[in-house]
Amino acid sequence: METTRNELNRNLAQMLKGGVIMDVTTPEQARIAEDAGACAVMALERIPADIRAAGGVSRMSDPAMIKGIQEAVSIPVMAKVRIGHIAEARILQAIEIDYIDESEVLSPADDVYHIDKREFDVPFVCGAKNLGEALRRIEEGASMIRTKGEPGTGDVIQAVRHMRTMTKQIRELASLRDDEVYEAAKQLAVPYELAKYVHDNGRLPVVNFAAGGVATPADAALMMELGAEGVFVGSGIFKSGDPAKRAAAIVQATANWRDADLLARLSENLGEAMVGINEDEIETIMAARGE
C-alpha cells in the first residue's frame, strides 16, 4: 500500500511539470496567480523576503489563512512546514492541503532529522542543493524536489548553482560502469537502488523544479534551460510593480523558454522588479538548513 501511495504522489507531482508555483499570502493574490496560469500556489503568511527582513522564528502558517486560500482557487494549494516538524505536517494533512513543502525557508524544528514522509498520504516537496540531498529526501518519501536557491533575495545565482551541481552529478552518475554505482551510492550517502535508478535513467525518480531568487521571465527561462522541469516563484511577483503582468509573463516564459523572441516581448514593460539582495550581502543562508 505504501508503494502504491508513493507512486500516486509522484504521479500527482508529475502533473505540475512545466508549470509555475507562486507564493501567495491572501486569497486575492491566489486568484491573481490562478488567473495568470499558475499550476499551483504556495500559501504562507509572509513571503520569503518578508521572513528574511523580519528575522526571528518563522513557523507554519495559520490553518485558517490557508483554508481561505484553498476556498479561493481551484488549482492545488501547497503550504510549508518546518524541517522535522511532524505535528505541523499532520495539521496540514488534516486540513486536506494538496502538497506539503518541508522548507528551509522556515526555522528548522529539528537539526538532525527530516520528517518521515512515507507516513503521510499527502505528497511532500523538499529542497536540495545537490544530488545526494535530493536522493536522501526521496528516500524519506519526497514526491518532488526543488533547488533550494536563496529565497527572498531576487538573486538567482544560488538556484543556478544548485541546478548545475545536480545535473552535473546526474550526468556523472549516469556515465559510470554498472560495478561503480555501489561506490557512488556510498559517497553520496544514498541507497544503492536510488543511485541505480539515476544511473539507468539519467534523471531523478521524481520531478525537479527550480526555486530561490527567480524574479523575471528571463530567470525562469534560464532555470528551464539548465534542466528544471518547472519553477517556484516567491517574492519576485508580489514584491514587484505589476504582479499580475509579471506572473503571467513568468508562466509563459516557463512554458516557452526556448522562444527568445517571445521572451523579449514578455520582458517589456513589466514594471519595477523586486529590489533584491546580492548573494554577498546575505546574512542568513537558508539553503544551508537541512542537508
Swiss-Prot record:
Residues annotated as the enzyme's active site: 80
The protein's name: Pyridoxal 5'-phosphate synthase subunit PdxS
Keyword Lipoprotein: no
Disulfide bonds: none
PANTHER family with a match to the protein in the record: PYRIDOXAL 5'-PHOSPHATE SYNTHASE SUBUNIT SNZ1-RELATED (PTHR31829:SF0)
Function comment: Catalyzes the formation of pyridoxal 5'-phosphate from ribose 5-phosphate (RBP), glyceraldehyde 3-phosphate (G3P) and ammonia. The ammonia is provided by the PdxT subunit. Can also use ribulose 5-phosphate and dihydroxyacetone phosphate as substrates, resulting from enzyme-catalyzed isomerization of RBP and G3P, respectively.
GO molecular-function term, one example from the UniProt record: pyridoxal 5'-phosphate synthase (glutamine hydrolysing) activity
Positions bound to D-ribose 5-phosphate: 23, 152, 213, 234-235
Annotated gene: pdxS
Pathway in which the depicted protein is active: Cofactor biosynthesis; pyridoxal 5'-phosphate biosynthesis
SUPFAM superfamilies linked: Ribulose-phoshate binding barrel (SSF51366)
